[in-house]
């Protein structure tokens, strides 16, 4: 069976579907207002649609010569199908178009599956942010900071 897979700009009318995925995939999910703010500020936000259904998304922000990946998710029933890789490739291509020199992200140190996806895409572990993410038991978890070098950094 052939699937139709499209990566499209995120719009406000897609946020119900995006929020459903956010709540399903993140221990400390964004609130709808976070997505509203990102769209209002013109951040690079895309949704992956599989056969007309939102199956993933990402939001990234352009800074001075760098892009920061703010949030990224694929529904559990669409994971391990290359969708994350496809979205990352699109984000990297866009980052190159913006003349960014690097692409940055943070993720929970316990998120081994995502860590593998990012490392396979060429991201390097740069640093830890101690006690960055809240956990359901009221404690905190470290974040792994990762970077993908896109161009030659100035000396």
Segments from the language model and where they lie:
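Conserved catalytic-core motifs of GNAT/GCN5-like acyltransferases
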Residues: 104-106, 119, 124-142
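Structural motif
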Residues: 98, 116, 120-121
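Extended hydrophobic secondary-structure segments
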Residues: 18-21, 103-111, 132-133
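Short glycine/proline-centered loop/turn elements that form peptide/ligand docking sites
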Residues: 88, 111-114, 131-137
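Preference for well-ordered, secondary-structure-rich cores of eukaryotic proteins
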Residues: 53-54, 85-86, 102, 109, ...
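Acetyl-CoA-dependent GNAT
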Residues: 2-81, 85-90, 94, 98, ...
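Short hydrophobic clusters on alpha-helical segments that form packing/core surfaces
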Residues: 91-95, 103, 114
């Amino acid at each position: 069976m052939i699937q139709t897979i499209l990566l499209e700009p995120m719009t406000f009318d897609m946020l119900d579907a995006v929020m459903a995925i956010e709540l399903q995939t993140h221990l400390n999910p964004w609130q709808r207002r976070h997505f509203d703010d990102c769209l209002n500020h013109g951040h690079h936000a895309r949704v992956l649609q599989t056969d007309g259904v939102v199956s993933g998304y990402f939001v990234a922000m352009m800074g001075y010569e760098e892009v920061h990946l703010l949030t990224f998710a694929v529904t559990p029933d669409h994971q391990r199908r290359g969708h994350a890789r496809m979205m990352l490739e699109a984000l990297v291509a866009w980052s190159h178009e913006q003349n960014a020199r690097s692409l940055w992200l943070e993720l929970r140190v316990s998120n081994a599956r995502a860590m593998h996806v990012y490392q396979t895409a060429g991201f390097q572990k740069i640093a830890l942010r101690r006690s960055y993410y809240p956990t359901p038991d009221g404690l905190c978890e470290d974040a792994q900071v990762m970077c993908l070098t896109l161009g030659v950094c100035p000396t």
